[in-house]
Design a protein with these regions (language model features):
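Bacterial N-terminal signal peptides
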Residues: 7-17
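Positively charged n-region of N-terminal signal peptides that target proteins for export
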Residues: 1-4
Length: 501
C-alpha cells in the first residue's frame, strides 16, 4: 500500500511539474495588440523554456505582430484559438533575421538555400512541436521573386527547418506563407497533420527528409506547388527524400484566401484577364490555376519509398513525378486519388537532364512506380498524360491501373505541335515542349495527343485505363515513340477498346 501511495505521489509530482512548465508569452511582455512587435517577448519565453530543459510556450488569444521567432529544442509552441501571429512589415530599420551567410547557391535558388530569413526557424534542433488552433498571417512575407529576395530584414518563409529531428506541426491555419509556407530540409521524423494552408506559393516543401507523415491537410496554392517533395543540394551533399506517406489531403488552386472564406473563387474563364506573376521568372503571365502533388523539381538526391493515398485535387495541377538533376526516383505508390477540373496534365512523368548538381553527376532514373485507382473529371485537354524520358534514358517499370480520365475536349489538331522537341534541359512542366495558353487574338499551342504522350519508356503496363471527352477532339488519342515492352489491358476510349500503340 505504501509503495502504491509513493508511486501515485511521484506521478502527481511529475504531472504538476509538467503543468508548471508552461511559459505564457504575455508574462514575458507580449502586448498582443497587433501593433507592438512581440517577437522579442516570444523569443524570451522560448529561451527561458529551453534554459529550463524544455516546455510549452503558450500564445493566448490576441494579435501578435512579429519578426523572426527562433525555435529551440524540446519546445512546444502552442497557439490558442484566437491567437493570430502576424508577419510584421519590416520598417524603421527593423525586420526579420538575415539569411545566414554562405556560398552563393549553385544548384538551387535563394529560397531553398537559407532558413533564418523566416517568420519561424530552427536549425539543428530536436523535439519541436508547433500546434494549436491559432492563425498565422504571412501577408507581409516575400513571395521569393523580384528585387527584395536577398534584402536583409525581409522574410520569404513562414516556417523553415534545417537538419532537425522529431518535429510535429499540427492543426494550425496559414494565410499567404511567402515563397514557402514550410521549408523542411534534412529533417528526420516529422509529422504534419491537420493543417489548413491558403497560400500564394509553395505550401509544404519536404526536401531531403526521411520518415515523414503528412495527413489530413487542406492546401490551396494557386500559383505554385501544394505538397512537394524535393531532394536538392542545399545541404551541400546528396541526400534522398525517403519513407514519406501522404494521406487524406485536399489540394486546390482557387484564388488566394478563397478557401479560408469558403468562396472557392475560380479565375475568370478568359485567361487574358488573369494576370499573375510567374513564380519562376517574376514576369507577368496569364494563369488559370495551380497547386499539385509533386516529386521534384529539385532532384540532386532521389525519392524512395513514397506513398500517396486518399487525396483529392480540385481546380489545380495533377500528379507530377520528376527526376531532373541526377536523382533516382523509385518505389513510389500513388492510389485512391480523385481530381476535378484540373488544369494541366493529370499524370506527368519527366526524366530529364537539367543537371543542377555537381559536375559529373550522371542522369537519374525513374522506375518501379505504381499509380492506381485514380478518377479524374473535366481535366483540361491541352496537355494530356505525359510520360517522357530523354534519348538513352528511359522511364522504366511503371504500372498505371484502374485510372479513369475525363477531358474537357473541344481542341483541334490544327493547334497542335507538329513535332515535339526533346528539350532535355527544360524546366519540367506540362507546357515544356512548347505548349502555351492562348495569347490574345491567337489560338493555344497544344500537345499532338488528346489522351496521352509517351516517349523514351521501357516496361510500362496500362491495366484498366479509360479515356472520355466532354466535347469532340480530333487529335490522336495516344502519340508514342521509342516505347518498349508495353502491356495494354482494358484500355478504352469512350467505352471502346484501344488495341495498342
Amino acid at each position: 500500500m505504501k509503495k502504491t501511495i509513493m508511486i501515485l505521489a511521484m506521478l502527481a509530482a511529475f504531472a504538476l511539474q509538467a503543468f508548471a512548465a508552461v511559459y505564457n508569452v504575455r508574462d514575458f511582455g507580449a502586448k498582443a495588440d497587433g501593433v507592438t512587435i512581440d517577437s522579442p517577448a516570444i523569443n524570451a519565453a522560448i529561451e527561458k523554456a529551453a534554459a529550463d530543459g524544455g516546455g510549452m510556450v503558450y500564445v493566448p488569444a490576441g494579435r501578435y505582430a512579429s519578426y523572426s521567432i527562433r525555435l529551440a529544442s524540446h519546445i512546444h509552441l502552442y497557439f490558442e484559438k484566437g491567437a493570430v501571429l502576424i508577419a510584421a512589415e519590416p520598417k524603421n530599420g527593423e525586420g526579420f533575421d538575415a539569411a545566414e551567410p554562405g556560398p552563393q547557391p549553385q544548384f538551387q535558388d535563394f529560397g531553398h538555400s537559407h532558413w533564418k530569413n523566416s517568420l519561424m526557424w530552427g536549425i539543428g534542433l530536436e523535439d519541436i512541436t508547433i500546434s494549436g488552433e491559432g492563425f498565422i498571417d504571412g501577408s507581409n512575407l516575400s513571395g521569393g521573386y523580384g528585387d527584395n529576395v536577398v534584402v536583409n530584414g525581409v522574410a520569404n518563409k513562414t516556417i523553415a527547418l534545417k537538419e532537425c529531428r522529431h518535429v510535429i506541426i499540427r492543426d494550425l491555419t496559414f494565410l499567404k506563407g511567402g515563397h514557402f509556407c514550410l521549408l523542411a530540409t534534412g529533417v528526420e521524423d516529422m509529422v504534419l497533420s491537420g493543417l489548413t494552408i491558403d497560400t500564394n506559393r509553395d505550401a509544404l516543401d519536404i526536401d531531403c527528409c526521411r520518415n515523414v507523415r503528412v495527413s489530413d491537410c487542406l492546401v490551396n496554392s494557386p500559383y505554385d506547388d501544394g505538397i512537394v517533395l524535393k531532394a536538392s543540394y542545399a545541404l551541400g551533399r546528396f541526400m534522398d527524400t525517403e519513407n514519406v506517406a501522404i494521406t487524406n489531403c485536399n489540394i486546390s488552386g482557387y484564388a488566394v484566401g478563397s478557401v479560408l472564406d469558403c468562396t472557392y473563387k475560380k479565375f475568370a474563364e478568359n485567361p487574358y484577364s488573369n494576370k499573375a506573376i510567374n513564380p519562376h521568372t517574376g514576369k507577368v503571365m496569364y494563369h488559370r490555376a495551380g497547386g499539385r502533388i509533386k516529386l521534384g523539381t529539385e532532384s540532386s538526391g532521389g525519392f524512395k519509398n513514397i506513398a500517396v493515398t486518399n487525396c483529392t485535387l480540385q481546380y489545380c495541377g495533377g500528379l507530377l513525378l520528376e527526376s531532373m538533376d541526377g536523382g533516382h526516383l523509385e518505389d513510389v505508390v500513388i492510389s485512391n486519388i480523385t481530381m476535378r477540373d484540373c488544369v494541366d496534365s493529370p499524370i506527368f512523368f519527366r526524366l530529364g537532364e537539367r543537371m543542377r548538381s555537381p559536375e559529373g553527376t550522371p542522369v537519374g532514373t525513374i522506375k518501379r512506380v505504381l499509380i492506381s485507382d485514380v478518377n479524374c473529371w473535366n481535366n483540361t485537354s491541352w496537355y494530356g498524360i505525359q510520360i517522357t524520358g530523354t534519348p538513352g534514358h528511359y522511364v522504366e517499370d511503371v504500372t498505371i491501373r484502374n485510372v479513369h480520365i475525363n477531358y474537357e475536349g473541344g481542341c483541334s489538331k490544327a493547334d497542335a505541335l507538329k513535332s515535339v522537341p526533346e528539350n532535355i534541359k527544360a524546366y519540367p512542366d506540362p507546357w515544356m515542349f512548347g505548349c502555351r495558353m492562348p495569347v490574345k487574338g491567337e489560338s493555344p499551342i497544344i500537345m499532338p495527343s488528346k489522351g496521352m504522350f509517351l516517349r523514351h519508356i521501357k516496361g510500362i503496363t496500362f491495366d484498366g485505363l479509360h479515356f472520355s471527352f466532354n466535347q469532340p477532339d480530333d487529335r490522336e488519342l495516344i502519340v508514342s515513340s521509342d516505347v518498349k515492352d508495353v502491356i495494354m489491358r482494358d484500355v478504352t476510349f469512350e467505352g471502346k477498346p484501344v488495341k495498342g500503340l
